[in-house]
């Protein structure tokens, strides 16, 4: 969306959910309560996927009026997001497809349907598909980079599974820190964006421990 407030938050290491809560509730970052942050987090993820005031109210157990105020406050805070959503739908209506950051297409034949329910689903996909699809593009590029580096280094460690934005490895103990450096470098620098890609790592005898 190239929203200035979001870019500033990500580039300065500010927790976006806390920042959203701070602006919506008109309090300082330090005064944001866990409940405020929880509501802001739900709004951050829900609104971009087209959640309604009623849907947000149901999810947060608040009134529809409060739900609408949260959504209105969100768009006032992040006008770039609203612009992105509107432009994504408009472009999809003209082309009947949307594209990811690497140019993969998601065709939306129902975007101009006369059926409001069918059309609404296509409109939500017009907004969501470039986001989710671009995330998929980025992690797949990172996986290619990592596999190439593992082979170049002749490591015994192996990449074994991808789960959403997470990669799991079977890591030989002697290669622990080399693998960490290799993986982090590939994932954080595989593509240049207007905000940093940051990675956290963990080790353990099983997936649970690694978290």
Predicted feature descriptions by range:
Residues 1-211:
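Conserved catalytic core of nucleotide polymerization and phosphodiester-bond processing enzymes
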